[in-house]
Amino acid sequence: MSSSICVASSRLSLPTLLRNVCRSEFTADLGPRSEYKSFFAMQRAALAYRRIRGPRQFSSLTLADDIPTTSKQPPSRAANVSSVSQPGEPTKTGAGEIRASSHPSEVVSSSPRADSAKRKKASAPEATAGAKPAANESSDKKRSEAPRKSSLSILSKSKKKKEPWQIQKEALKKKFKEGWNPPKKLSPDALEGIRHLHAVAPDRFTTPVLAEQFQVSPEAIRRILKSKWRPSPEEMEKRRERWERRHDRIWSQMTELGLRRPKRSAEKFSDVKVLYDKPV
């Protein structure tokens, strides 16, 4: 049998191996001069990496050695890492990133600072664009909810049936604008005079005329004429005394203001007596 000679083994020689080892150590000692790699050097290094990746392709080392590399790791160590890593996994270097794929043209190289800057630039317009529609949607919702609430409140008020006492209260407010305790109060003599005038000449002393004359509401005159209640003699006497005290109190107040002359019956209601007749 004729011995078969390997072509790749025949190409290997001692001078070639020594030259490759010396060049790899020299490039490792030099190290990278700049922190950032150039795209051209990274591309050529990736091509050399793909050629080294194949089994028994030692001839490609000569082509890789002719190219000056800027990697921080020595080629021998890179070759060991490449042999251990799988073909589909990416390999990381000091300043960049090389992703190996099945397609030879897919070589991605980028720096962390450049990637972060690109991400910030891309996220800034997206954030502003996302915030504006959200604000517009919230304002539109508020505007749409406001008329809904107002219309619902109006409908609920209109649909809700009022109680009898509420209807009566509204009617009394329209009739008695001054309320149940008006400042103008009619004395018992005035009440009897209103009844007497209306009984003598009802066509002449009508309700509006009497209301204008006594300065009260027409509803008050109507109720006075309509009421059939009459006080007893005892109640009339109590009422007369009460109205006399009221008259003297008002007279004393007007005397203090200088509008009326002093009166003996009104002296007991004066504030002067309350202030100066206190026991020491």
UniProtKB/Swiss-Prot annotation:
Bias (Polar residues) ranges: 63-88
Indicate where this protein is primarily found: mitochondrion
Q: Has keyword Lyase?
A: no
Q: Looking at the keywords, is NADP present?
A: no
Matching entries from Pfam families are given as: Neugrin
Localized where? Mitochondrion
Superkingdom to which the source organism belongs: Eukaryota
Renumbered residue ranges of the record's region Disordered: 63-166
One GO cellular component assignment for this chain's record is: nucleus
Q: Which UniProt keywords apply?
A: Mitochondrion, Transit peptide
Q: Which positions form the organelle transit peptide?
A: 1-45
What spans are recorded as compositionally biased (Basic and acidic residues)? 138-148
InterPro entries xrefs: NGRN/Rrg9
* Job of this protein: Required for respiratory activity and maintenance and expression of the mitochondrial genome.
Provide the family line.
Belongs to the RRG9 family.
Query: What is the name of this protein?
Result: Required for respiratory growth protein 9, mitochondrial
Q: Which organism's genome codes for this protein?
A: Aspergillus fumigatus (strain ATCC MYA-4609 / CBS 101355 / FGSC A1100 / Af293)
- The encoding gene is rrg9
